A protein has these predicted regions:
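Contiguous, glycine/small-aliphatic-enriched amphipathic segments in soluble metabolic enzymes
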Residues: 1-135, 175, 179-264, 268-283, ...
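Flexible glycine-/small-residue-enriched beta->alpha junction loops
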Residues: 77-80, 148-150, 154-160
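Glycine/threonine-rich beta-strand-loop-alpha-helix active-site module
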Residues: 127-150
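Conserved hydrophobic/aromatic beta-strand scaffold that supports enzyme active sites
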Residues: 138, 151, 160-162, 290-292
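Residue-level signal for secondary-structure boundary elements
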Residues: 147-151, 326-329
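Ligand-binding beta-strand-loop-alpha-helix segment within the catalytic cores
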Residues: 153-183
Length: 335
């Protein structure tokens, strides 16, 4: 098998992305990767964080393999404004999204094994007319996927998928449908088999309402939407159960009964995994023809330039991207 590097995008240039990427390289345990970034800015961020880092400027991703063990490979990508750590500027928004597109193109062309995206500052991009709620939706559009993208959060202790992602909580009951639930769960089951090599995955589905609706006495979504979706999927042979009350499905004993938790909305899924293992959790976009992971935290502008940013989630994201790529090859699934 020909080795391929991983492409890492810079994310918000005023955030901690560059610092945690440098720390990931210095950790010396990651598979080969290169950073798409402004070389002068990388040196500046390294100085801010009091990090010494040898850098090798590359012209093509393949050159990563020649220099990675001796220097951090940088594929030059200019930002129009040199912003200070912790102080984002709107004029850099287009360069942030362009770096993501470059990485996706490399992945689609097969010259990189995966992409790992550093956190973006959503309000900055929104002011620049960025039309997507976040990375997940943007990546699906770049890959030409017409189905709703699926976010999976992964740690050693838990795998979890929110059916609805970046939506106001007040909108969730109107967005949630039997079709959406079935579609999301089928994508999740396929990812468990092909990306995580779990041959017969067990799926636990949460309710939407307190106590999973108590048979329709606290809301109607469980009876009208969630239970019919589960029964339909059982008919297809999936090992799936629920709806389970969300307040009882994440205990240590409860987690032994399933391989993945399917939750109805963002915080229902992310609160438990971040509580269990905040700095080692990874965001994965599943259902795409390419492999994409990301550290499961934001830009942390308050930590940018201090040298105090924790790189464990970035390290975990790089390692998991490599693992998923290799699992797909072993399972004969290019996605």
């Amino acid at each position: 098998m020909q080795e391929k590097p991983i492409a890492v995008t810079p994310g918000e240039p005023a955030g901690i992305g560059t610092e945690i990427t440098i720390k990931a390289w210095k950790n010396r345990s990651c598979p080969p990767f290169f950073l798409i970034d402004d070389v002068e800015r990388v040196y500046s961020r390294a100085k801010d964080a009091d990090l010494e880092i040898p850098i090798e400027v590359i012209k093509t991703p393949s050159q990563t393999l020649d220099c990675f063990h001796n220097a951090l490979p940088i594929l030059p990508h200019k930002f129009p404004v040199h912003c200070k750590a912790g102080r984002p500027v709107d004029d850099n928004a287009q360069s942030v999204t362009k770096a993501i597109k470059i990485a996706v193109d490399y992945a689609k062309e097969g010259v990189v094994s995966a992409l790992v995206t550093n956190p973006i500052q959503k309000e900055i991009l929104k002011r620049a007319k960025f039309e997507y709620p976040g990375h997940t939706e943007f990546l699906a559009a770049l890959c030409g996927e017409k189905t709703k993208p699926v976010m999976l959060l992964a740690s050693d202790q838990l795998l979890v998928v929110p059916v609805t992602i970046h939506e106001p909580l007040s909108n969730v009951p109107n967005i949630l449908t039997e079709q959406l639930l079935i579609q999301t769960i089928l994508v999740a089951e396929r990812a468990l088999k092909n990306d995580f090599s779990i041959n017969r995955p067990r799926l636990c589905v949460s309710g939407l309402n307190p106590h999973a609706g108590e048979n329709g006495t606290i809301g109607s979504e469980e009876e009208a939407i969630i239970k019919p979706a589960i029964e339909s999927l059982k008919m297809r042979g999936l090992r799936i159960f629920g709806p389970v009350a969300a307040d009882s499905m994440f205990s240590e004993n409860a987690r032994l009964e399933y391989d993945i938790a399917i939750c109805m909305y963002h915080d229902q899924a992310l609160i438990p995994i971040k509580t269990l293992d905040f700095w080692n959790s990874v965001n994965v976009t599943i259902g795409l023809p390419i492999v994409r992971t990301s550290p499961d935290h934001g830009t942390a502008l308050n930590l940018a330039g201090t040298g105090e940013a924790d790189a464990n989630s970035m390290i975990a994201a790089i390692k998991l991207a490599d693992k998923i790529y290799r699992n797909r090859l072993a399972n004969g699934d290019p996605e």
